[in-house]
Amino acid sequence: METKEGRQVRVMEGNMAAAQAVLLSKPDVISCFPITPQTSCGEALSKFVADGLLDADITEPEGENTALSILIGASMAGGRTFTSTSSQGLSFMYDAYLFTAGNRLPIVMAIAMREQVSPHGVVAGQQDAILVKAAGWIQFYAESCQEILDSIIMAYRLAEDSEILLPVNICYEGFYLSYHSQRVEIPGQEEVDRFLAPAGKAERLKLCLENPMTFSSYTVPGELYTEYRFKHCAAFHRAKQKYEQIDEEFSNIFGRRYGGQIEEYRSDDADVVIVTMGSCTGTAKAVVDKKRDAGLKVGLIKIRMLRPFPVERLKKALNGKKAIGVIDRNVFYSGFCGHVFFELQSVLKELGPPIPVSLNFIAGLGGTDIVPQMVERVIETAYSAAEGKAVKPVTWLSLE
């Protein structure tokens, strides 16, 4: 179905939504190596090129490290680039992954998230993307197929901004989103061209025969190396406010608003808030609606931008709450908790008094469903904590 401005409404899987976003963003070079559950994204892009719909160079690397290394060269030469991967593929490209961030290359990568080995399991999880969150890439986590498409388009606008120039991950759960079909509105090409036009005009250093230069040469220990890291951190910090502006502009053009770094859902007057990240958010929103209808003052906050961590937005959103229940689909081993819960502690200590009670709920590991009954238990437990009752700080929902 076609709507205004050349937009189309289709039912498609998350991987196809990612491919459609890349098609609309017009990259110069695409380099993907097949790995479940990402493979169909790369296949779709190859078909777009073969059918003449996309004017881009498609490479056929022998592995993930090479796939990203090819894009490093293309990006250094000034090209717009894209890749996608999952799980062990992401681990295999770790060397190139670090090189990309350190060189401030605006490469966009989709991660169809999957559990890492061992034990082996080709199932949904967030652990693969979570493990590289300290590598210097900006990271976004999507709730739906529509958000995958929109986030990739916005990622190019952010990554290629002359004040940012950092690589961006768009992360979404494998299987639950990569192979799950949903209604998706595809923007018109002219709309996307207008939205991305500022990114295409951004100034950055490029490899050029007329003006030869060296990228990533050996750096003598001392002030120069420190300056590299300082400027990277400064750009990371700027990305938070810059993305708020990009999200606002995207909303004005395309009519879809995501809230910037976080989405606040019925949380303004809530006593209890649950914090989610990824595909389980839709289920959690439905439970919040049900509890609201029953008279409970409960809300939800969805983490969209994990890196850089949205400290300022979370401080404002969580201030004055009585209890917070964080649902994590990942594990932070040394903390015996989830990563989002652990990150959130640095925010909570700056709130109050009183500081909200914070609880962690590990769920959905190994591709298991996060069902409404689990979310109801999160809310009930958080309410008990808000009333001063003794509850466990961390609960593994599938085991306890």
Language-model regions, residue ranges each:
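Thiamine diphosphate
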Residues: M1-L131, G136-W137, I153-M154, E173, ...
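Glycine-rich beta-alpha junction loops
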Residues: R114-E115, Y172-Y179, A199, G278, ...
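Peripheral docking tails and interdomain loops at the edges
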Residues: D328-E400
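Short helix-loop-beta junction
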Residues: S46-D51, E249, A286-L300, K349-E350
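Glycine-/acidic-rich phosphate or pyrophosphate-binding loops and their flanking alpha/beta elements
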Residues: E13-M16, E248-V272, K285
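Redox- and metal-dependent alpha/beta enzyme cores, enriched for Fe-S-associated oxidoreductases
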Residues: E264-L296, F309-K316
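Conserved thiamine diphosphate
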Residues: V123-P167, C171-G174, P353-T368
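Conformationally flexible catalytic loops at phosphate/diphosphate-handling active centers
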Residues: P167-E263
